[in-house]
Amino acid sequence: MTKSRKQKQKKQDFLRKKLKVGKPKEKARNATDTSFVSKTISIRNQHLDQNPHDLTKRLTLLKHHNINVRKETLTTFQKSIPSIIKSRLMTPLLTQSIPLICDESQQVRQGLIDLVDEIGSHDAEILKLHCNIFVLYINMAMTHIVTQIQADSTKFLSHLLKYCGDEVVRKSWVKLLNGVFGVLGWGQVGKNDSASIVQTKKRNAKYVTIHLNALYTLVEYGCQDERARSDGDTAETTEDSGTLRNPYLIPDYPQPFEHLKLFTRELKVQDATSSGVNATLLSLATQDIDTRKAVFIEQFLPIVRKKIEVIIKEGGECGKSANKLKTLLAKIFD
């Protein structure tokens, strides 16, 4: 009996039932009833955005794989700077956006430059607080394997010097000079010239002009005080540089004893001479103008004067920038 009943049930699955007039079609046994009405649907771990203007959730988009998303995110933050300049969002914003100095897209890098200009025009002190991170990634860009990233590195340096030049030259005077020499292809003291970029006439003159202008600004901030930059009076500068200032005055900048490195740990450089890095210069504190000028005269000035003479003879925009740099060097060191 049981076997015959199962056979009948199996046969019913393959039989087409006759529809009767006036009666609806029967529903399947596994049909789901969707006729219920609910006022709310609760989904775990999913919440509606209560504040559509909250920019903290956009920070992760700065690491998005799409170039347009990164660019649009930088533009959004740039437009929002006036309203968030005094908020706690600035620190994570700069921490997430500064690595874009080495971004593969030129549009993203230009968007970051515009963002830095917008922040600096509202409050330059914020850029000064993140000066170390800026210098770190600028140095990385100067030695980057991609030529375009390397060429744009001095753009970031020029814009950073415009808002916090004194902070930059005090902390990384020698490193930045070595980096600018590298992108110009001039070779540095203690290094092989073939290791740097070879300077040829085929190189884009536009980028050479940008590099020379960045070097001009770096030397201007590193070897001149604020009064000399504004007035252009060299006599007062040389007179004041030799006088002993009151050591008990409140310093003009934060962390005046940072160069002593009392609470920092540094990695030991093994065989620094063989690697081509002058460890003495890199560890030298360049807090004052006199020290920076002495380092520049001893290590960099002869090379700069030799190279700019060649560029001046070639003429063009590069020649103008080189002549401008030559005038500055004569004003400071002659």
UniProtKB/Swiss-Prot annotation:
The keyword Cell membrane does not apply. One of its GO terms (cellular component) is cytosol. It is found in: Nucleus. The keyword Signal does not apply. InterPro entries: ARM-like, ARM-type_fold, Ipi1_N. Its main location: nucleus. SUPFAM superfamilies: ARM repeat. Residues 1-32 are annotated as: Disordered. Keywords: Nucleus, Ribosome biogenesis, rRNA processing. GO terms for molecular function: chromatin binding. PANTHER family: REGULATOR OF MICROTUBULE DYNAMICS PROTEIN, TESTIS-EXPRESSED PROTEIN 10. Component of the RIX1 complex required for processing of ITS2 sequences from 35S pre-rRNA. Component of the RIX1 complex, composed of IPI1, RIX1/IPI2 and IPI3 in a 1:2:2 stoichiometry. The complex interacts (via RIX1) with MDN1 (via its hexameric AAA ATPase ring) and the pre-60S ribosome particles. Belongs to the IPI1/TEX10 family. Present with 4420 molecules/cell in log phase SD medium. This is Pre-rRNA-processing protein IPI1. It comes from Saccharomyces cerevisiae (strain ATCC 204508 / S288c). The lineage of its organism: Eukaryota, Fungi, Dikarya, Ascomycota, Saccharomycotina. The gene is IPI1.
